[in-house]
Amino acid sequence: MKRPIIIALDFPTAERALAFLDQFPADLHVTVKIGMELFYAAGPSIVTDVQARGHAVFLDLKLHDIPNTVESAMRVIGRLGVTYTTVHAAGGHVMLSAAKRGLVAGAMAAGVTAPKLLAITQLTSTNQAILNQDQQIMGTVRASVVHYAKLARASDCDGVICSAQEVQAIHTAVGADFLGITPGIRPASAQSDDQQRVMTPAAAAKAGSNGLVIGRPITQAAEPVQAYRDIMTEWSN
Protein backbone atom coordinates (compact mmCIF):
# COMPACT_ATOMS: atom_id res chain seq x y z
CA MET A 1 0.00 0.00 0.00
CA LYS A 2 1.42 3.37 -1.03
CA ARG A 3 0.16 5.28 2.04
CA PRO A 4 -0.61 2.68 4.70
CA ILE A 5 -2.52 2.89 7.91
CA ILE A 6 -0.28 0.93 10.25
CA ILE A 7 -2.13 -0.74 13.12
CA ALA A 8 -0.06 -0.74 16.31
CA LEU A 9 -0.31 -4.25 17.78
CA ASP A 10 0.37 -3.11 21.34
CA PHE A 11 -0.53 -6.42 22.98
CA PRO A 12 1.41 -8.30 25.69
CA THR A 13 1.17 -11.73 24.06
CA ALA A 14 1.17 -13.28 20.61
CA GLU A 15 -2.14 -14.98 21.36
CA ARG A 16 -3.92 -11.68 21.94
CA ALA A 17 -2.31 -10.01 18.95
CA LEU A 18 -3.22 -12.84 16.58
CA ALA A 19 -6.74 -13.11 17.99
CA PHE A 20 -7.17 -9.42 17.21
CA LEU A 21 -5.90 -9.89 13.64
CA ASP A 22 -8.14 -12.89 13.11
CA GLN A 23 -11.14 -10.54 13.29
CA PHE A 24 -10.10 -9.16 9.90
CA PRO A 25 -11.44 -10.88 6.76
CA ALA A 26 -8.91 -13.08 4.99
CA ASP A 27 -8.92 -10.79 1.94
CA LEU A 28 -8.24 -7.63 3.97
CA HIS A 29 -4.48 -7.38 4.23
CA VAL A 30 -3.17 -4.63 6.49
CA THR A 31 0.14 -3.31 7.77
CA VAL A 32 0.79 -3.78 11.48
CA LYS A 33 3.39 -2.43 13.87
CA ILE A 34 5.11 -4.91 16.15
CA GLY A 35 6.80 -2.99 18.93
CA MET A 36 9.07 -3.80 21.83
CA GLU A 37 6.49 -5.34 24.17
CA LEU A 38 5.10 -7.86 21.70
CA PHE A 39 8.42 -8.69 20.05
CA TYR A 40 10.20 -9.23 23.37
CA ALA A 41 7.31 -11.40 24.60
CA ALA A 42 6.84 -13.51 21.48
CA GLY A 43 10.15 -13.34 19.62
CA PRO A 44 10.68 -13.41 15.84
CA SER A 45 7.95 -16.02 15.39
CA ILE A 46 5.31 -13.30 15.81
CA VAL A 47 6.61 -11.72 12.61
CA THR A 48 6.24 -15.01 10.74
CA ASP A 49 2.76 -15.61 12.18
CA VAL A 50 1.56 -12.17 11.08
CA GLN A 51 3.08 -12.52 7.62
CA ALA A 52 1.47 -15.95 7.21
CA ARG A 53 -1.90 -14.17 7.48
CA GLY A 54 -0.95 -11.95 4.55
CA HIS A 55 -0.16 -8.82 6.53
CA ALA A 56 2.88 -6.56 6.21
CA VAL A 57 5.03 -5.85 9.26
CA PHE A 58 6.55 -2.65 10.59
CA LEU A 59 9.07 -3.88 13.20
CA ASP A 60 9.48 -0.96 15.58
CA LEU A 61 12.40 -1.72 17.90
CA LYS A 62 13.99 1.76 17.82
CA LEU A 63 17.59 0.56 17.89
CA HIS A 64 20.12 2.90 19.53
CA ASP A 65 23.56 1.48 20.35
CA ILE A 66 27.12 1.56 19.08
CA PRO A 67 27.34 1.24 15.28
CA ASN A 68 28.72 -2.31 15.21
CA THR A 69 25.97 -3.62 17.49
CA VAL A 70 23.25 -1.88 15.49
CA GLU A 71 24.64 -3.16 12.19
CA SER A 72 24.67 -6.74 13.48
CA ALA A 73 21.13 -6.48 14.83
CA MET A 74 19.87 -4.94 11.61
CA ARG A 75 21.45 -7.78 9.65
CA VAL A 76 19.15 -10.14 11.57
CA ILE A 77 16.12 -7.89 11.08
CA GLY A 78 16.88 -7.63 7.37
CA ARG A 79 16.37 -11.39 7.01
CA LEU A 80 12.84 -11.29 8.43
CA GLY A 81 11.13 -9.83 5.37
CA VAL A 82 9.54 -6.93 7.25
CA THR A 83 8.49 -3.79 5.38
CA TYR A 84 9.72 -1.12 7.79
CA THR A 85 12.00 -0.94 10.81
CA THR A 86 13.32 1.83 13.04
CA VAL A 87 16.46 3.29 14.56
CA HIS A 88 17.00 6.42 16.68
CA ALA A 89 18.37 9.36 14.69
CA ALA A 90 20.08 10.54 17.87
CA GLY A 91 22.58 7.71 17.41
CA GLY A 92 24.28 9.80 14.74
CA HIS A 93 25.45 9.46 11.15
CA VAL A 94 27.84 6.54 11.65
CA MET A 95 25.24 4.47 13.50
CA LEU A 96 22.49 5.25 10.98
CA SER A 97 24.71 4.29 8.06
CA ALA A 98 25.69 1.08 9.83
CA ALA A 99 22.01 0.26 10.34
CA LYS A 100 21.36 0.62 6.62
CA ARG A 101 24.32 -1.59 5.73
CA GLY A 102 23.12 -4.28 8.10
CA LEU A 103 19.59 -4.24 6.71
CA VAL A 104 20.74 -4.50 3.11
CA ALA A 105 23.22 -7.28 3.89
CA GLY A 106 20.66 -9.30 5.84
CA ALA A 107 17.99 -8.94 3.17
CA MET A 108 20.39 -9.91 0.39
CA ALA A 109 21.48 -13.02 2.30
CA ALA A 110 17.84 -14.07 2.74
CA GLY A 111 16.77 -13.16 -0.78
CA VAL A 112 14.11 -10.71 0.39
CA THR A 113 13.48 -7.01 -0.15
CA ALA A 114 15.30 -4.82 2.35
CA PRO A 115 13.00 -3.02 4.81
CA LYS A 116 12.55 0.72 4.66
CA LEU A 117 14.74 2.23 7.38
CA LEU A 118 12.94 4.91 9.37
CA ALA A 119 14.73 7.14 11.86
CA ILE A 120 13.02 8.24 15.06
CA THR A 121 13.25 12.03 15.35
CA GLN A 122 11.41 13.11 18.49
CA LEU A 123 8.78 10.93 20.11
CA THR A 124 5.24 12.30 19.92
CA SER A 125 5.27 12.35 23.73
CA THR A 126 8.07 14.95 23.62
CA ASN A 127 6.98 18.52 24.31
CA GLN A 128 8.95 21.74 24.58
CA ALA A 129 9.75 21.28 28.27
CA ILE A 130 11.04 17.73 27.77
CA LEU A 131 13.17 18.85 24.83
CA ASN A 132 14.76 21.80 26.62
CA GLN A 133 14.95 20.57 30.20
CA ASP A 134 15.31 16.78 30.04
CA GLN A 135 17.18 16.42 26.76
CA GLN A 136 19.03 19.74 27.09
CA ILE A 137 18.33 20.51 23.43
CA MET A 138 17.75 24.22 23.00
CA GLY A 139 15.37 25.44 20.32
CA THR A 140 11.99 24.14 19.22
CA VAL A 141 10.72 20.60 18.79
CA ARG A 142 10.20 21.28 15.10
CA ALA A 143 13.79 22.47 14.63
CA SER A 144 15.08 19.33 16.35
CA VAL A 145 12.89 17.09 14.18
CA VAL A 146 13.99 18.78 10.96
CA HIS A 147 17.64 18.51 12.02
CA TYR A 148 17.27 14.78 12.62
CA ALA A 149 15.46 14.38 9.28
CA LYS A 150 18.37 16.02 7.47
CA LEU A 151 20.79 13.74 9.31
CA ALA A 152 18.71 10.67 8.45
CA ARG A 153 18.54 11.61 4.78
CA ALA A 154 22.31 12.11 4.66
CA SER A 155 22.75 8.68 6.28
CA ASP A 156 20.75 6.71 3.65
CA CYS A 157 17.59 6.29 5.71
CA ASP A 158 14.35 6.04 3.76
CA GLY A 159 12.33 8.29 6.02
CA VAL A 160 11.55 9.33 9.55
CA ILE A 161 8.98 8.83 12.26
CA CYS A 162 7.61 12.24 13.20
CA SER A 163 4.47 14.07 14.21
CA ALA A 164 2.17 15.01 11.34
CA GLN A 165 2.68 18.60 12.48
CA GLU A 166 6.26 18.42 11.21
CA VAL A 167 5.84 16.55 7.90
CA GLN A 168 5.56 19.64 5.72
CA ALA A 169 8.70 21.16 7.24
CA ILE A 170 10.57 17.89 6.69
CA HIS A 171 9.49 17.58 3.07
CA THR A 172 10.51 21.19 2.47
CA ALA A 173 13.91 20.55 4.03
CA VAL A 174 14.83 17.18 2.51
CA GLY A 175 12.39 16.45 -0.32
CA ALA A 176 8.87 15.10 -0.70
CA ASP A 177 10.17 11.62 -1.60
CA PHE A 178 11.51 11.18 1.95
CA LEU A 179 8.93 9.25 3.98
CA GLY A 180 7.24 10.88 6.94
CA ILE A 181 5.41 8.17 8.89
CA THR A 182 3.32 9.66 11.65
CA PRO A 183 2.08 8.28 14.96
CA GLY A 184 -0.01 10.43 17.29
CA ILE A 185 -3.04 10.09 15.00
CA ARG A 186 -6.46 10.19 16.62
CA PRO A 187 -9.94 10.47 15.09
CA ALA A 188 -11.68 13.64 16.24
CA SER A 189 -13.81 11.64 18.71
CA ALA A 190 -10.84 9.92 20.39
CA GLN A 191 -8.75 11.00 23.37
CA SER A 192 -5.08 11.87 22.83
CA ASP A 193 -3.98 9.54 25.68
CA ASP A 194 -0.25 10.07 26.41
CA GLN A 195 0.51 11.68 23.06
CA GLN A 196 1.38 15.39 23.08
CA ARG A 197 1.48 16.24 19.38
CA VAL A 198 -1.61 14.70 17.76
CA MET A 199 -3.61 15.17 14.56
CA THR A 200 -6.66 13.65 12.88
CA PRO A 201 -6.27 11.36 9.84
CA ALA A 202 -7.80 13.96 7.51
CA ALA A 203 -5.48 16.69 8.79
CA ALA A 204 -2.47 14.36 8.50
CA ALA A 205 -3.38 13.64 4.88
CA LYS A 206 -3.50 17.36 4.12
CA ALA A 207 -0.16 17.81 5.90
CA GLY A 208 1.47 15.28 3.57
CA SER A 209 1.98 12.28 5.87
CA ASN A 210 3.11 9.17 3.99
CA GLY A 211 1.62 6.71 6.47
CA LEU A 212 -0.21 6.70 9.79
CA VAL A 213 0.46 4.65 12.91
CA ILE A 214 -2.75 4.13 14.88
CA GLY A 215 -3.23 1.89 17.89
CA ARG A 216 -5.95 2.26 20.49
CA PRO A 217 -8.63 3.88 18.28
CA ILE A 218 -8.58 0.61 16.29
CA THR A 219 -7.38 -2.07 18.72
CA GLN A 220 -9.70 -0.95 21.53
CA ALA A 221 -12.70 -0.18 19.32
CA ALA A 222 -15.90 -2.16 19.79
CA GLU A 223 -15.68 -3.10 16.10
CA PRO A 224 -12.00 -2.91 15.07
CA VAL A 225 -12.49 -3.78 11.40
CA GLN A 226 -15.10 -1.07 10.96
CA ALA A 227 -12.93 1.40 12.87
CA TYR A 228 -10.04 0.61 10.52
CA ARG A 229 -12.25 1.07 7.46
CA ASP A 230 -13.68 4.34 8.75
CA ILE A 231 -10.21 5.74 9.39
CA MET A 232 -9.02 4.50 6.00
CA THR A 233 -11.91 6.34 4.35
CA GLU A 234 -11.05 9.56 6.17
CA TRP A 235 -7.37 9.12 5.32
CA SER A 236 -7.96 8.29 1.66
CA ASN A 237 -10.41 11.12 1.03
Swiss-Prot record:
Protein name: Orotidine 5'-phosphate decarboxylase
SMART domains recorded: OMPdecase (SM00934)
Lineage of origin: Bacteria, Bacillati, Bacillota, Bacilli, Lactobacillales
Recorded name of the encoding gene: pyrF
Disulfides per UniProt: none
Annotated catalytic residues: 62
Record-listed E.C. numbers: 4.1.1.23
InterPro entries attached to this UniProt entry: Aldolase_TIM, OMPdecase, OMPdecase_AS, OMPdecase_bac, OMPdeCOase_dom, RibuloseP-bd_barrel
CDD domains: OMP_decarboxylase_like
Pathway(s) per entry: Pyrimidine metabolism; UMP biosynthesis via de novo pathway; UMP from orotate: step 2/2
Class of this enzyme: lyase
GO CC terms in record: cytosol
